[in-house]
């Protein structure tokens, strides 16, 4: 059962998340040869100030 966690900046609409979750699920089904009902997608909205690259805030 794939659990796919998407971490991104806040600000996306629920419609955007719905569409993205459907696209991710479709890809997981095709690539991983699993059932749609087994794919879980979780969105984590994390403020930009929580993102760092090479020790530096983005």
Q: What does each model-found stretch correspond to?
A:
Residues 2-58:
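A domain-level signal for the structural core that forms small-molecule/cofactor-binding pockets
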């Amino acid at each position: 059962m794939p659990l796919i966690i998407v971490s991104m900046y806040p600000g996306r609409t629920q419609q955007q998340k719905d569409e993205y979750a459907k696209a991710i699920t479709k890809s997981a089904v095709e690539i991983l040869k699993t059932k749609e009902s087994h794919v879980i997608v979780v969105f984590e909205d994390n403020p930009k100030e929580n993102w760092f690259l090479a020790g530096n805030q983005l």
